[in-house]
Swiss-Prot record:
Residues 702-714, 780-797, 807-818, 828-840 have a biased composition (Pro residues). Residues 653-683 are annotated as: Interaction with LASP1. Residues 569-573, 830-834 are annotated as: Interaction with VASP. Residues 149-169, 193-229 have a biased composition (Polar residues). Pfam families: I-set (PF07679). Residues 683-713 are annotated as: Interaction with SORBS2, SPIN90 and SRC. Detected in both muscle and non-muscle tissues and cells (at protein level). Isoform 3 is widely expressed, isoform 4 is particularly abundant in tissues rich in smooth muscle and in the cardiac muscle and isoform 1 is detected in heart. The lineage of its organism: Eukaryota, Metazoa, Chordata, Craniata, Vertebrata. This is Palladin. Gene3D superfamilies: Immunoglobulins. Disruption phenotype: Death around 15.5 dpc due to severe neural tube closure defects and herniation of liver and intestine. Palld-deficient mouse embryonic fibroblasts display disorganized actin cytoskeleton, decreased polymerized filament actin, and decreased cell adhesion and compromised cell spreading on various extracellular matrix. Mice embryos lacking Palld exhibit defects in erythropoiesis. Residues 807-842 are annotated as: Interaction with SORBS2, SPIN90, SRC and PFN1. InterPro entries: Ig-like_dom, Ig-like_dom_sf, Ig-like_fold, Ig_I-set, Ig_sub, Ig_sub2, Palladin_C. Belongs to the myotilin/palladin family.
Length: 1408
């Protein structure tokens, strides 16, 4: 039941009466244990039951309305189309009401409220916040009415005369309410209970009993006008007309009875001097910021007297300090600023406001993302908006409150919540919300719930595949993975990762399955099962693997495993499937119905009472998802109304008829039919904003209300935003685009393990790997549980198959995707005319949207339109580097990249050229990445634009704040579209290095010489330490290209700026670098031609007396002529990449965390070597780089091949060796070692000199010793000459004694010419004997022996006796052998003394 009527003729709910005459104490009674949705249903059931007896009790209507009416002004008039009896009845009652009005005693405030036109149409927070007193008042309505002091006797008599029927009527209503109350009481008892008795979390979606009384009216004022539309979604016009008068009376009754009991209590809209409890009109917003960034929390609170405001972090009170600054402005705006946030600051921040009348609080999660954090960058986008930009969105309202079961303000879930107002609610209701209280204590919160389901994924063979889901539930959670029903065990091929919750306030686990290298046999249905003590849930997704030789990847066109999820369940849908994907297509009041009793576990008996008309017009069919849709098909012939009230609080859509059901078989037939129609269409481009009706149902949508269509750059998005056959869905998507800049769109995903999903966070389109059934993309573009599919045939495989040169105009390719705030400015930025009425749905080709079939989301269409490798072609889920834009997914660019809007040049040749140019830009990387041929479109564009015209857009990081972009702030990624400057994410290792550099720099002295002249130090008011409004990015460029680092710094006084490269300060007078600083604080460092030496970390440090702050950007300079690269690279072009390896590719830079490229760097390298021929030569080197470099060796420019003499080894410690054994003269020369990886190459040279092997010669006696005789006392010389190479060593021996050293009498001599001499001064008889000389070198040894005889001068030798000359035996020279002399060799015949061999009298003897 709606909170307000969609017709100004009668009250549709008690909320209208509550606004008019109910006092504050009335609210808490029933709302303490009933949610708003449950109360809605309660009232609706009661009305339906009462309606059944309306005919018999019709006569009592007049009586009751007379009794309970309060003010003619406060009552709605009967609509012109109401049934005559109702019209007559109410018209006849008005005069009586007017006469009775003054008689009823009312306080001035009540009268003011009742008659105030401003309060008349304010939607109530709850349609039926009934208390037991209200139930009693219904039962006692007759008595109370009779006792009311009323001077008019006529109405009194009439009332008494019809007391019987009226009593029956009241009893019925009271009975129904009591029955429903008892049902809901147990299911919702602790609802809105938190440790402090409140539930004012910004995204809880509920008002706590403590807050409700004072918050009601303001919340009503800010409530989305879509509450008015809920009536059309729940009831058709006939039901309302029949019930109008009855509701009128019931509301009068409530107004009559309740204020009597509660008049003394203060009213929400009383004059300011009356005390009011605190109420937060602007709540805190959860944030996720990078470490070191500034955290800014703000909220607004009202109350009388002015509330006392206190701040808490994780329950610990915070006080004003230099680190945490707490401010209060104008008594309402309270801010908490953390100048520099660290990981320790992560937690739940609560602002508590108290005064004597009560208290209120608001909480938000602040997550400080550390250097190695793996959470999403873009997650914080939804929280960034300027304070006060949309004050209405900050107020309490349940009309668009969607939570996933917990009061945690930020779950980190990747549920894209497109909200009509930028309410600070970043979560989406799952169907389990009815089980779950904000304090997370009930069974619904204990049960596991997937906050992000698995997404259908397609990948190429060899790519990394990552399947990720997020689950919350009471620990311990056991997560299991299955493929085709078989459990998957953790292994190197299938890594199962599970990230535990980062806080108890946010008990969400990230479960990831990583397939390191995918093969076609890995495809199939993957299931993740989460189990705890309270139950288990599963999430399923399909993985499609295409062969490596396929250029294009077709998604599963049926996706039955996912569509079956909804079709095989009984009416209460499973909690895991009624996910947040339902919500975006619903209006807020519809959203409330997601959690309404027809989904409740305790409402099985009552479910059948909600007829098809009501359930389906609510847009929620238990088995068919939201808006009666499956795969984009609508049930019925009536399109849902456009959310006009999103912008205009007074606009109300026409009633919505019930939608008939469609079975899956019929759906499939319709899908095939639409596909066939699409194949036959040429798809002429339509003006932007023309909604598309791709349904075959033959129905036309109602005219669109006047609110701005999406920006002109998104013709496809404007027209194709909804695969639903309804213009209003397109309008809702348009509305969502217009509202995103205020943070209402939250598509958060983890940094790691998301492959090629960049478009999702930027434009709200589901990504090719997403499955709507996973509830991770609850947007109008993915409202159904089936994955978008491709047609079985060729329709979405190659554009050539869809349109050719004969087509009137090629379909506009996807426009550049901007970050949310830039792409979807607030409505006043683009004051466009309202879109024209939708085309007849039967045409099925009004504008480009109809190009994708009913089972396709626009993202599928976009990915199909671009001929490419499989959409996740740049899959790099592990956060490892990527250098190619994901197929079909343009990189984000700034708005300035668009020269003329599509609207301005639609249908012209310029439009075609511009669109083709865009596509070429997005396809450039793919073309250079091994794609063998150009598509027709690209060939055409190159004819029109020239071959070198397509360039890659720079990447705008998601961290860029909406405020900066909307204000036209300088872009963080500098350089125009012609730059090849690409951003990328640094690894955690690099980040630690960067942090270390910054830490040291901020604590080290700097060179002030080249700094700009600063004003002398003067006292400064509001002095603030420097901080970066825009930080440096990390870039990857090619050698020779220009690069610019840009950031923006602020501080008071104006900070000084210093630049460093790898920790060394860069002089402002440097010739290589140009340093600039603008007046707005933008600082830049530019080099026109980068070299390999420019590779490194660039740090900017800003300093003023308040402190220092630094920021670092990594520059990777890649060599141009590395292996596999084309040496030619057109000017301004990103250089072609060499083909990637099978299992890893170097994908797009805007991935959450990419593979990092580090050029090889030699940590160890040998110098020049000289090696003797025949010896072993070993060259050792050590190299670093990422990926691990490949090493190759060259000799004089020629590759060295491994063979028996040349071996290449790698040791465990990473040392590479080239071993040559033995070395020959051919091995001499210049050796080059080349290390190569994807990031570039490096090399070193050395010279090897091979020393020739010497011609070794054994010693040879050229002159031998001679036998000598000498007279006693005379000197004697024993001489010989020996030669050998190398020169031999000489050893002397006398008999068996070695002569080791010279004495005064006996000395040994040797010269350089080989002459050897033994000189004996004054020979004696003892000197006589055999003397041996030996010569030895490496080649051998030789010896020579001679006899010395000493005789007296007077002794005459007898002539008769022949002297005996004895040759000693070899044994006499055993001592020589001991010295290593080869005695046998020494006594070869040629070595023997000639005089011995010639002497015939020579005899062998052992004795002398």
């Amino acid at each position: 039941m709606s909170e307000t009527s969609s017709h100004d003729s009668f009250y549709d709910s008690l909320s209208d009466v509550q606004e008019e005459g109910k006092s504050a104490d009335f609210f808490p009674g029933l709302s303490a244990f009933l949610s708003q949705e449950e109360i809605n249903k309660s009232l609706d059931l009661a009305r339906r039951a009462i309606d059944s007896s309306e005919t018999e009790d019709f006569d009592s209507e007049k009586e009751i309305s007379q009794i309970f009416s309060k003010s003619p002004i406060s009552l709605c008039e009967t609509p012109s189309h109401e049934e005559p009896k109702s019209g007559k009845q109410t018209s006849s009652e008005r005069p009586q009401d007017s006469r009775r009005a003054p008689v009823q005693p009312l306080t001035g405030d009540q009268a003011e409220r009742i008659t105030s036109p401003g309060s008349k149409r304010k939607p109530g927070v709850s349609p039926l916040l009934a208390s037991p007193s209200y139930i009693r008042s219904l039962r006692k309505a007759e008595k109370r009415g009779a006792k009311n002091p009323n001077p008019s006797s006529k109405p009194k008599t009439a009332q008494q005369s019809k007391a019987g029927p009226q009593s029956q009527l009241c009893d019925k209503a009271a009975s129904f309410i009591e029955e429903l109350t008892s049902i809901f009481r147990e299911a919702a008892k602790p609802r809105n209970r938190s440790p402090n008795g409140e539930s004012s979390s910004p995204d809880s979606g509920y008002l706590s009993p403590k807050n409700q009384p004072s918050a009601l009216m303001s919340a009503s004022a800010s409530q989305s006008p879509t509450a008015d539309q809920l009536d059309q979604l729940e009831m058709d016009a006939e039901v309302k007309q029949a019930q109008g008068s009855l509701c009128y009376q019931a509301h009068q009754a409530s107004e009559e009875t309740l204020p009597l009991a509660h008049i003394p209590h203060p009213q929400p809209q009383k004059a300011r001097h009356l005390p009011t409890a605190p109420r937060f009109i602007q709540k805190l917003r959860s944030q996720e910021v990078a470490e070191g960034s500034r955290v800014y929390l703000e909220c607004r609170v009202t109350g009388n007297p002015t509330p006392r405001v206190r701040w808490f972090c994780e329950g610990k009170e915070l006080y004003n300090s230099p680190d945490v600054q707490i401010h209060c402005e104008s008594g309402e705006l309270h801010t908490l600023v953390i100048a520099e946030a660290f990981e320790d600051d992560t937690g739940r921040y609560t602002c508590l406001a108290t005064n004597p009348s009560g208290s209120d609080s608001t909480s938000a999660e602040v997550f400080i993302e550390g250097a190695s954090s793996t959470d999403s960058d873009s997650e914080s986008l939804s929280f960034i908006s300027k304070a006060g930009a949309m004050p209405q969105a900050q107020k309490k309202t349940t009309s668009v409150s969607l939570t996933i079961g917990s009061s945690a303000p930020k779950t980190g879930v990747t549920t894209a919540v497109i909200q009509p107002l930028s309410v600070p609610v970043q979560q989406a209701h799952s169907a389990t919300s009815y089980l779950c209280r904000p304090d997370g204590t009930t069974m619904g919160c204990l049960l596991p719930v997937f906050t992000k389901e698995l997404q259908n994924t397609a990948a190429s063979e060899g790519q990394v595949v990552v399947l990720e889901c997020r689950v919350r539930g009471a620990p311990p959670l056991q997560v299991q993975w299955f493929r085709q029903g078989s459990e998957i065990q953790d292994s190197p091929d299938f890594r199962i990762l599970q990230k535990k919750p980062r806080s108890t306030a946010e008990p969400e686990e990230i479960c990831t399955l990583v397939i390191a290298e995918s093969f076609p046999e890995d495809a199939g249905i993957f299931t993740c099962s989460a189990t705890n003590d309270y139950g288990s849930v599963t999430s399923t997704a399909q993985l499609v693997i295409t062969s490596a030789n396929n250029e294009n990847c077709s998604y599963d066109s049926t996706g039955e495993p996912n569509s079956d999820h909804f079709q095989h369940f009984p009416p209460p849908p499973p909690i895991l499937e009624t996910g947040s994907y339902e919500l975006a297509s619903q209006k807020p009041s519809e959203i409330q119905q997601v959690n309404s009793p027809n989904l409740g576990f305790s409402m099985a008996a009552l479910q059948m009472q909600f007829n098809t008309a009501e359930r389906e017009t609510n847009g929620v069919h238990p088995s068919h998802g939201v808006n009666g849709l499956i795969n984009g098909k609508a049930y019925g012939n009536k399109s849902p109304p456009t959310p006009t009230a999103l912008l205009s609080p007074t606009k109300e859509p026409p009633p919505l008829l019930a939608k008939p059901k469609l079975d899956p078989l019929k759906l499939q037939q319709l899908q095939n039919q639409v596909r066939l129609e699409q194949e036959a269409c040429a798809w002429p481009p339509a003006p932007p904003g023309v909604p598309c009706n791709s349904s075959s149902s033959g129905s036309s949508a109602p005219p669109s209300p006047p609110f701005p269509p999406p920006p002109p750059a998104f013709p496809e998005l404007a027209a194709c935003a909804s695969p639903v056959p309804s213009e209003p869905m397109s309008a809702l998507a348009s509305r969502a685009t217009a509202m995103q800049s205020s943070g209402s769109f939250n598509y958060a995903r983890p940094k790691q393990f998301i492959a090629a999903q960049n478009l999702g966070p930027a434009s709200g389109l589901p990504t090719p790997t997403s499955s709507p059934s996973s509830s991770s993309l609850p947007s109008p573009l993915s409202p159904t549980p089936r994955p978008f599919g491709r047609a079985p045939g060729p329709p979405f495989v190659e554009p050539e198959a869809m349109w050719g040169p004969s087509s009137p105009s090629p379909p506009p390719p996807p426009p550049p995707v901007f970050s949310p705030s830039a792409a979807y400015p607030v409505p006043d930025v683009f004051p466009l005319p309202p879109p024209p009425p939708p085309l007849p749905s039967s045409t099925s080709h009004c504008a480009s949207p109809a190009r994708f079939g009913p089972s396709q989301t626009p993202a599928a269409f976009l990915s199909a339109l671009l001929p490419s490798q499989p959409p996740p072609v740049a899959v790099n889920a592990l956060g490892l580097p990527k250098g190619v834009t994901p197929a079909g997914f343009p990189k984000k660019s700034s708005r300035t990249a668009r020269i003329a809007s599509d609207e301005e040049i639609q249908g012209t040749k310029d439009a075609v050229i511009q669109d083709l140019e865009r596509k070429l830009r997005f396809k450039e990387d793919l073309l250079n990445n091994g794609q063998p041929r150009l598509t027709y479109e690209e060939r055409m564009a190159r004819r029109l634009l020239g071959a070198d015209s397509a360039n890659v857009f720079n990447i705008q990081e998601p961290e860029e704040t909406a405020a900066n972009q909307d204000a036209g702030a300088p872009r963080a990624s500098v350089g125009g579209p012609l730059d090849g400057q690409k951003e990328y994410k640094v690894s955690s290792c690099e980040q630690r290095l960067i942090s270390e550099i910054e830490y040291r720099l901020e604590r080290s002295p700097v060179d002030e010489s080249g700094d700009e002249v600063q004003d002398p130090d003067v006292p400064v008011e509001n002095a603030t330490a420097p901080f970066f409004e825009m930080k440096l990015k990390h870039y990857k460029i090619f050698e020779g290209m220009p690069v610019t680092f840009t950031c923006r710094v602020a501080g008071n006084p104006k900070p000084k700026i210093y630049w460093f490269k790898d920790g060394k300060q860069i002089s402002p007078k440097s010739d290589h670098y140009t340093i600039q600083r603008d007046l707005d604080g933008t600082c830049s460092l530019h080099t026109t031609a980068s070299t390999l030496d420019d590779d490194g970390n660039y740090t900017i440090m800003a300093a003023n007396p308040q402190g220092r702050v630094s920021c670092t950007g990594r520059l990777m300079v890649q060599a141009v002529n590395q292996r596999g690269r084309s040496p030619r690279s057109p000017s301004g072009h990103p250089h072609a990449r060499r083909p990637r390896s099978r299992s890893r590719d170097s994908g797009d830079e805007n991935e959450p965390i990419q593979e990092r490229f580090f050029r090889p760097h030699f940590l160890q390298a040998p110098g020049d070597l000289t090696v003797q021929e025949g010896k072993l030569c070993r060259m050792d080197c050590k190299v670093s780089g990422l990926p691990t470099p490949d090493l190759s060796w060259q000799l004089d420019g020629k590759p060295i091949r491994p063979d028996s003499a040349h071996k290449m080894l790698v040791r465990e410690n990473g040392v590479h060796s080239l071993i040559i054994e033995p070395v020959t003269s051919r091995d001499a020369g210049i050796y080059t070692c080349i290390a190569t990886n994807r990031a570039g190459q490096n090399s070193f040279n050395l010279e090897l000199v091979v020393a020739a092997k010497e011609a070794h010669k054994a010693p040879v006696f050229m002159e031998k010793l001679q036998n000598t005789g000498v007279a006693d006392g005379y000197p004697v010389r024993l001489e010989c000459r020996v030669s050998g190479v190398p020169p031999p060593q000489i050893f002397w021996k006398k008999e068996n004694e070695s002569l080791t050293h010279s004495t005064e009498r006996v000395s040994m001599h040797q010269d350089n010419h080989g002459y050897i001499c033994l000189l004996i001064q004054g020979a004696t008889k003892e000197d006589a004997g055999w003397y041996t000389v030996s010569a030895k070198n490496e080649a051998g040894i030789v010896s020579c022996t001679a006899r010395l005889d000493v005789y007296t001068q007077w002794h005459q030798q007898p002539q008769t006796t022949k002297p005996k000359k004895v040759r000693p035996s070899a044994s006499r020279y055993a001592a020589l052998s001991d010295q290593g002399l080869d005695i046998k060799a020494a006594f070869q015949p040629e070595a023997s003394p000639s005089h011995l061999t010639l002497n015939s009298g020579l005899v062998e003897s052992e004795d002398l």
